[in-house]
Amino acid sequence: MIKLIGCVLIISACTQMGCAMATDKIRQMKYLKLFRRLIFETRAMVEGGMTFGEIILKLSLQKDYSDFTFLSQDTSSPDVRRRITEEIHKSKLFDNEIRQTAIDFFEKLGTTDINGQLAYISMSLAALDEQISRLSENFTSQVRLCRALGVLSGAFIAILLI
């Protein structure tokens, strides 16, 4: 009886681990799409002639981007750009490739004329679109695979213990 209870606990723990991995994949896609929308909205702000500080302030006040803690920096400080990039680097919201795209975006934002910024925004959007399409190719199968691997690993461990 104790072995059976132990096996059920192991299977349920491994199932939860698989669900956590699947949730992580879903969260990664959510934040990637949200960051793409942030860059797209930034394009309109740059076209409107807003400065770097105004853009960061406006983005930080929007509820959609409340998970992006790197936006909540004091824009009156001269080293706001450096602090934002440091916060992005520490952030766990993105994987390494997307994190580097975000760092590059905020390092370049507001450093050139409007046409240069718009060109760089277009390049950043193209890079994010490529990353989104790459992640979307097998997204549902990867989520299902994570869940299935959790259940199967739990069953395998339970069988080994019996």
What is the meaning of each model-derived region?
Residues 37-44, 104, 123-130:
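Short amphipathic alpha-helical coupling elements at transmembrane boundaries
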Residues 84-115:
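Short, non-transmembrane cytosolic segments of multipass membrane proteins
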Residues 70-96, 158-161:
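Membrane-anchoring/interfacial helices and their immediately flanking loops
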Residues 110-151:
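Membrane-interface, cytosolic juxtamembrane amphipathic helix immediately N-terminal to a transmembrane helix
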Residues 28-31, 53, 80, 98, ...:
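Residue-level recognition of alpha-helical structural elements
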Residues 3-73:
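Juxtamembrane/interface alpha-helical elements of multi-pass membrane proteins
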Residues 5-17, 136-162:
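Bilayer-spanning, highly hydrophobic alpha-helical transmembrane segments
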Residues 62-66, 78-79, 127:
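A short structural micro-motif
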